[in-house]
Amino acid sequence: MNSGGAGFSRRAFLGAGAAIGGLALLAPTRAGVARAAAPFEPTREVTLTAGEMELKLLGPDKPATRILAYDCTPFQTLRMPRGTRLKATFVNGIDEGSTLHFHGIRMPNEYDGVPTLTQPLVQPGSRFVHLLPLDDPGTFFFHPHCDETGQAGMGLAGVLIVEDTRDPAFDAEHVLCLKDWRLAPDGSFLPLTEPEGASKAGTFGATRTVNGAAALELKAPAGGHARLRILNIDSTRIMDIGVEGGDAWLIAVDGHALPPVRLDDLPDGIWRMGPAQRIDLDIRMPADGSPVTLGDYRAADIYHFATLTAEGRVSKPRKGPLALPKADLPQPDMKRAARLSFTLQQATGQAVKEIALPADDPLATALIDSLCVGATTYWGIQSESWPTGANRSVPPPLARMTTGTSYVVEIKNETRFPHPVHLHGHAFEVRASSLDRLPRHFADTVLVQPGEAVEIAFVAAPGDWVFHCHILEHMETGMMGWFRIV
């Protein structure tokens, strides 16, 4: 990879395909992690091969960029029915180690794609098989979970849509992947991380795209309802998604249905979404055929990324909104829930401590591959930081939990910057915000503003699950930990 940057100095000495002292051996077996009792019978099989391809991100008449993609398809979209038993084989066709993580999918822990913690790093030319029960309908995505700033920053991501036959029939549907790119005028990549960005809000790209284009013109019938699945797959940027020209309702967050919320009734008439977050919108097209525009309103220079224009007309307009079936998820027992609290911090000598796993822990002697750690620590959770630099030992879990127990977790942000916090392997209920800005909903990632405390609740599923900021530079420079659930 040629993504460069101060945060990942290992690129200076890692050659293509090189392994460091056998550190990418099989991840240790972990006691207490449940595996499926019944044989897994796949009903669908796919192979996803990571590789390079060219894409003209700067414009049709400008130089092309060598990006990363699965199966030479930018932001490849897979569609499968709810209930699918998916056998997904990841083939690493790039020149450094990688893994595949299916973001937001509730799955057996061994298929989560986190190197060292749940599986070995997949070396160039090697493969790894994931067995995934797709029981939750919605909009999900997949991406690497090592050197994410480099690999995802260069485009390595895809979309997984789990379809539900119970959904209402929309008159149109579109999938929109929002991503920025850090490009030089010749189409090459600028450094994807810089210390000034990694230690603050992140290193931003200036070339903004939706599905790899500057903007899109989409079609929907006049008077009809269009379902828009919007994914923020950027490494850094937080976006304020708004709609002009038509009625719009928020009908799902991170794939999970919620009672429709009119976008105009939310604070500032927008939905704020950080990296890795997804929303589904129901947009009712004007009966007179006038267009509807979608934009990111976070900056003064609004980025209008899509326009819905009328094509045809529905014969029997529906008032709407078109609600999705209620999410069928484990419901936390609030009367018996255990309570925990975690604080997001900027790392200083006083704020972050180094502690080790007990000597008898199966992961005590495991080392994280140098590819998967940053060079510098800037961030921490609860006075602990994920390893960086020469420290590559797996840290102790932030918490030990019990399978099947309900937990209420408070996430407090003591930093000056917002953080989209993601918990693997679970769908949690976002129950409360100290800023009183969020409707109650289920999600796998929640954006926590500076000075805010957000309360989430979930039923613990067995495994070793990471808990991290999804601004990728923040994660790779310390803001990641893990929960052990047995």
Q: Model regions: which residues?
A:
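Histidine- and aromatic-rich segments of cupredoxin/plastocyanin-like copper-binding domains
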Residues: 111-112, 116, 120-123, 191-334, ...
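Extended terminal and domain-junction accessory segments
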Residues: 16, 22-25, 32-49, 152-184, ...
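Aromatic/His-enriched, Gly/Pro-containing loop or helix-boundary segments
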Residues: 70-71, 75-77, 109-139, 146-149, ...
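Active/binding-pocket-proximal capping segment
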Residues: 245-258, 414-443, 462, 472-476, ...
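Short tyrosine-centred short linear motifs in exposed loops/low-complexity segments
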Residues: 83-84, 126, 134-140, 223-224, ...
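N-terminal edge beta-strand
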Residues: 62-79, 206-217, 375-403
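N-terminal secretory signal peptides
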Residues: 1-8, 12, 19
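Asparagine-centered strand-capping/turn motif at beta-strand->loop junctions
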Residues: 90-94, 231-233, 411-415
